[in-house]
Structures are given as structure tokens and as C-alpha cells.
Amino acid sequence: RSARERRGKSQRAAPGNRPPPGLPPRLGNPTTEYLERVLFQLEAHHVIEKALAVDEKEPTIGALIFGSGMGAISTLALAVCRAGDAILAGNVYGCTDSLFRGLGKFGVEAVFCDMGNVAAVEAALDAHPNVAMVFLESPENPTLRIADIEAISRLTEPRGALLVVDNTFCSPYLQQPFRLGADLVMHSLTKFVNGHSTSIGGALLGPFRFMKTDFFPWYKDVGATPSPFDSWLNGMTVQSLAPREAQQSATALEIARFLSTHPKVASVGYPGLPDFPQADLVRRQMRSGGAILTFEVKGGVSAGEAVMNYFGRKDTPMELAVSLGSCITYIQHPASMTHAVVPEADRLARGITPGLIRLSVGLEGAEVLVEHLGRALDLT
């Protein structure tokens, strides 16, 4: 049977079906359950509305909170895949990539393709009928390439593969993959949901029977569960998600416009710009361009390192860091930082060029960030 048939899809659900009181807190606690309900409402409010319209008291989506995003992905892979299956993934987070490749020792094949090319996804699915799970990020990191989630869902549905969307880069404010046909949605809560870099966390949302029955034994046995304190921190900070992301997106657009006209910048990648290659797709599935942008500085690796050296000083408003989603602006140079150990040919194949710089825009004033970017570029 297919992964979809093996795991099933329920018709009725509730976001917080937990074991009775008195059991170990690893199996659930009120603080974590509160965060589950909040994320459920953010990602699946359209399901709630539909249920209310037909006088149903129980929606169809369940949520579970993890100690990290990788805890969520690892537990998901163990629960969904078995020997002989394959995972089809795009250009994903490095640890996700490593995890999927590492599953080969258990007989699970990792297959990779360009998720921004629907025809390539279809060809990969046809070539690997044993795909149990399609896992994608949209936008991808750090290239910001967008996957057409709805089109891909039309490919996975008849083939019995589960479509999993890592919605970390967007958060529920900017994108709701369930509306577009995703079966499961995951988050690294560490990023935009927390928004303050104060906690690590992960989340997985999906059909209730899968989340609370088939999947729950893996959740409790793998043990990648959060502490109540981390759930409390994330439950507090998520309340400001909408105003934070709205402001961050607006600031990112201003910065992208500035960089687009700068003589030392070869190109700018920002989904909110009208000339972004996939602008039509962005308008269909995202609220705005988001808080992440990239730009290619002329001069290659040395120019990128010069910009990093400027922001490595303590008197600048940006922090040299590889994380994202904080109210503080983070800047990083993939070729000399996150992807320095990746062979240059592999970096180029992934769209990571020598002068590529990634910005995760925070809540500082746009004029301050633009001023310091200008100063940094003057040094290249």
C-alpha cells in the first residue's frame, strides 16, 4: 500500500487529544497543548471555518510540538518511511539533506530534484514509484526559489505519496500550505514563530488520525519533545507574529529596492519584487515577499567576505549569524559560512554563487539598515 493509504486520513479531529493526567510530561502538558492549539488555528483556520459551516465540532487537523525542527523531521521520517521506500526532496536545509541521505543505511532512498520545476518533480515521481514522501521548502534556502505547492499536490495525490511542506521561511502568516493541498506542514519554531531567538522548537501538523494515533507512538518513543518552558516562550512570542512579519516584509522590500539600484550589486533575489522570476506564483500562494532576501555582490567571495567583516563589528545594527526569523537583522555569506565545506561545483549547482549574501530582516528601521548596507558595499 502507498504511504498515504498506510497512514490514512481522518474525517474528524481535535487539536489536543492527549493521554490522561498523571503520565510523564513528555507525553503532553497544558502549556504545550496551548501552543498546539495556536498553531492549529494559524495554519488551519480555513478548516475550522469549513467545519463550523457544516455544524461540525471537530476539525480535521492535529498538531504536535517538538524540541526542534529537526526533531519533527526525524520523527516524521521514521514514522512514514520503511525499507524500500524513497523520499523525494528539493534543495532543503543541510541537516534535513543529511538526515535523508543517512536513511539509506535503513533501506530508504533519498532522491533530489528541482522543486521549482513541476515537470522535474513529475519525472522524478514517475522514475521512483516507491516515493512515500515528497518534502519541500518554499521558498528554498538560500536561493528563495518557490515551489508550486498546489501543482505538486496534484502529482502526489494519485501516486499515494505524502506531500510535506517545511513552512519555516514563511510561517502561517505568509503562507498556509494546507490550502494548497499539502498533507503535512512542519516548522522550525526557532525562527519566525518565536521571532526573538530565545527558544528552540519544532512543530508538525497533519491529519488527525495520523498525528494522534499512527504518529503519536513515534513522538513519545523518539522523545524529541519540548520542555514546558520552551513551549511557554513560543506561545508568548507567536502572539506578535502578524505585526512582526508585516513590518519585516515591508522593510525587506525597501532594502531590496535599494540594492536593486546599487552599482556594486549584480542581482537581488526577493519574492516581493515585481521582477522576481516567479512573481506570479508568489502572488498566488504568499501574502507578501517575506523577510528574507538575497543579493549578489560584485567581486565574488572576497567581496562577500568584506561585507561580512563590516557587519562583524559591534557598532552595526546587523548580526553576523546563520539563523533567521528574529526581530534582529541577521546577515550571512553562504560561500564562506554555511556552505564553505560544500564543493564549489555543488554550491553553484544549488544556485549559491560566490558573492551571494542572505539577509533575514528584523524590526530595525529600514533607513538604518540601508545606510549600513551602503557603507559595507563601499568597502568591496
What are these regions (language model features)?
Residues 1-19, 210-215, 318-340:
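Mobile, glycine-enriched helix-loop/loop "lid" segments at the mouths of ligand-binding/catalytic clefts
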Residues 155, 254, 258-262, 306, ...:
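Generic non-transmembrane alpha-helical segments
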Residues 49-264, 269:
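Conserved PLP-enzyme active-site core in the AAT-like
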Residues 42, 237, 296-300:
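A structural micro-motif recognizing beta-strand termini
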Residues 3-71, 75, 95-103:
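Conserved N-terminal alpha-helix of the aminotransferase class I/II PLP-enzyme fold
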Residues 2-3, 206-210, 297-300:
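Short loop segments at secondary-structure junctions
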Residues 45-55, 85, 94, 102, ...:
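PLP-dependent enzyme catalytic core of the Aspartate aminotransferase-like
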Residues 267-357, 361:
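Conserved C-terminal alpha-helix-loop-beta "cap" of PLP-dependent enzymes
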